Structures are given as structure tokens and as C-alpha cells.
Swiss-Prot record:
InterPro entries: Trm112-like (IPR005651)
Domain of life: Bacteria
Species of the source: Gluconacetobacter diazotrophicus (strain ATCC 49037 / DSM 5601 / CCUG 37298 / CIP 103539 / LMG 7603 / PAl5)
Name the UniProt record assigns to this protein: UPF0434 protein GDI0182/Gdia_2252
Coiled-coil annotated residue ranges, if any: none
GO cellular component, one term: cytosol
Family named by the database record: Belongs to the UPF0434 family.
Length: 63
């Protein structure tokens, strides 16, 4: 599986994950394969179905 072809993220997993920076909610962007934290302005990648919740691995959102 590549970063651009993501399997659906389990809704149960999404319900327990929070942004590691703000502890706020995340939004799943299936097309981009990312979990978005609007509060932190960061997009966390999902690689091979595994969310990478490290702030150093996140990309800043365009303002």
C-alpha cells in the first residue's frame, strides 16, 4: 500500500486519537492520507495504514 492509496481508517481508532500537540480532535482526509489538526495547523501522515503522530513528521497546513 502506498501513501496515496489508503485503506479506510478504522472509525474506532479515529475516535480515540487526538492531536499530540493540542490534544484536540483530528479530521481524516482519506484522499491525502492524513489526519488533520486544524487547531495545530498540522497534517499527520498515515503510512501503510498507521497514523504517524509525531509532530516532527507532520507537515504544516497552508494558511
Amino acid at each position: 500500500m502506498t501513501e496515496t492509496a489508503q485503506a479506510p481508517l478504522d472509525p474506532r481508532l479515529l475516535s480515540v486519537l487526538v492531536c499530540p500537540v493540542t490534544k484536540g480532535p483530528l479530521i481524516y482526509d482519506r484522499e491525502a492520507g492524513e489526519l488533520i489538526s486544524r487547531q495545530a495547523g498540522l497534517a499527520f501522515p498515515i503510512r501503510d495504514g498507521i497514523p504517524i503522530m509525531l509532530p516532527d513528521e507532520a507537515r504544516p497546513l497552508d494558511v
